[in-house]
């Protein structure tokens, strides 16, 4: 999409690259660009990632005929909920079961096909999607909170909805300033 390319140009080419060009180890960053193109009935979703200065994307994650959930950051809690297993499973199978990479991939595919939670569907009401987003954010926060070590996720969350007819709309928003300086929309 043109918008995803423009976001990549602004975020990566014009800001990230000049800021970190001289660094030996560059920070990783990733973001998702999602929404409705002009005159389109269905939304699209693109992912852009920068790993140590190497850019991947914009990559089409979800086309106009697909629905789903995308998450980044601390994925473990949501991976377990949606897929039914930990992201560490392939490494455990390789180390403890001495399985080949091909056998591991086949097993992971079988588990995903049979254990993935179907929590999202095409006719899902917007309020259900909002509630699911809130649930997944708090699931991740609490998973991090109760895992050994310092919590790496927390604080107030922000939720926005993008619909064809209402466009971008804040649902839950952190207000750092008074509402006249930081308006709802």
Provide a role label for each language-model segment.
Residues 1-185:
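N-terminal nucleophile
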């Amino acid at each position: 999409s043109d918008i995803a390319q423009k976001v990549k140009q602004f975020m990566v080419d014009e800001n990230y690259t000049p800021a970190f060009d001289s660094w030996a180890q560059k920070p990783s960053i990733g973001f998702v660009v999602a929404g409705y193109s002009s005159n389109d009935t269905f939304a699209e979703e693109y992912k852009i990632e920068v790993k140590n200065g190497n850019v991947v994307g914009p990559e089409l994650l979800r086309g106009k005929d697909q629905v789903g959930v995308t998450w980044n950051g601390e994925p473990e809690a949501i991976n377990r909920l949606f897929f039914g297993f930990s992201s560490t499973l392939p490494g455990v199978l390789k180390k403890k079961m001495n399985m080949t990479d091909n056998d591991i991939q086949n097993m992971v595919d079988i588990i995903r096909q049979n254990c993935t939670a179907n929590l999202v569907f095409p006719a899902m009401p917007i309020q259900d999607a909002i509630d699911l987003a809130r649930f997944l954010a708090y699931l991740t926060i609490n998973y991090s909170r109760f895992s050994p070590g310092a919590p790496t996720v927390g604080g107030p969350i922000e939720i926005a909805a993008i619909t064809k007819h209402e466009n971008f709309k804040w649902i839950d928003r952190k207000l750092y300033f008074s509402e006249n300086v930081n308006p709802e929309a």
